[in-house]
Amino acid sequence: MIEIIEGIYKGRSEGKILVSINGVVFGIITDAESFSEFNEGDKILVYTKLIVSQEDMTIYGFDSKVKKETFEKLIKVSKLGPKTAIKILSSTTVDFLSNAIATGDVEKLSSIPGIGRKTAERMITELKDEFEVVEVNEEMLEAIEALVSLGYSKTQARNAVSKVLKESPNISNVSKIIKEALKILAKI
């Protein structure tokens, strides 16, 4: 198995990233948000899942271990393949998905593009015990939305806001969170 790939980021092309390792360039299918903040030539660490079928060997990659584990859980659901799992992870956050499955919220899951009511019900039935409710900080979500509206990617915004809240956990004013996150993002 290929668990982690470390190499040089070579760009993004049609739903996959290109990673060079000692002159060999791997095409790794990934969700829309993972690795969106990288530039060509950056060193990159990719959590991977190799899926072998009769026709193909495909590497799926993620920017976090949690996202990879979520992908692995999703592809266990009957009639839900890796392509659909990638679409799901491209359309929502792991926390949103975790909360919707853990609480049995069919409506929330059905709001994800590509997920109908029957698929949502199947996901809940087959995965309910594998996900836990994650406490969501409303100020954090609002700050992330504001940063995304300013042109930052969800990943950049989430990372910056998380860093602000880790360094100053008592900040509850959204505008202060955004201001501090912008300082962090300006350094990138």
UniProtKB/Swiss-Prot annotation:
It comes from Fervidobacterium nodosum (strain ATCC 35602 / DSM 5306 / Rt17-B1). GO terms for cellular component: cytoplasm; Holliday junction helicase complex; Holliday junction resolvase complex. Its main location: cytoplasm. Homotetramer. Forms an RuvA(8)-RuvB(12)-Holliday junction (HJ) complex. HJ DNA is sandwiched between 2 RuvA tetramers; dsDNA enters through RuvA and exits via RuvB. An RuvB hexamer assembles on each DNA strand where it exits the tetramer. Each RuvB hexamer is contacted by two RuvA subunits (via domain III) on 2 adjacent RuvB subunits; this complex drives branch migration. In the full resolvosome a probable DNA-RuvA(4)-RuvB(12)-RuvC(2) complex forms which resolves the HJ. InterPro entries: DNA_helicase_Holl-junc_RuvA_I (IPR013849), Hlx-hairpin-Hlx_DNA-bd_motif (IPR003583), NA-bd_OB-fold (IPR012340), RuvA (IPR000085), RuvA_2-like (IPR010994), RuvA_C (IPR011114), RuvA_C_sf (IPR036267). The RuvA-RuvB-RuvC complex processes Holliday junction (HJ) DNA during genetic recombination and DNA repair, while the RuvA-RuvB complex plays an important role in the rescue of blocked DNA replication forks via replication fork reversal (RFR). RuvA specifically binds to HJ cruciform DNA, conferring on it an open structure. The RuvB hexamer acts as an ATP-dependent pump, pulling dsDNA into and through the RuvAB complex. HJ branch migration allows RuvC to scan DNA until it finds its consensus sequence, where it cleaves and resolves the cruciform DNA. Residues 142-188 are annotated as: Domain III. The lineage of its organism: Bacteria, Thermotogati, Thermotogota, Thermotogae, Thermotogales. GO terms for molecular function: ATP binding; four-way junction DNA binding; four-way junction helicase activity. Residues 64-142 are annotated as: Domain II. This is Holliday junction branch migration complex subunit RuvA. Residues 1-63 are annotated as: Domain I. It holds the Pfam family RuvA_N. Keywords: Cytoplasm, DNA damage, DNA recombination, DNA repair, DNA-binding. The keyword DNA-binding applies. It comes from the Bacteria. Residues 142 are annotated as: Flexible linker.
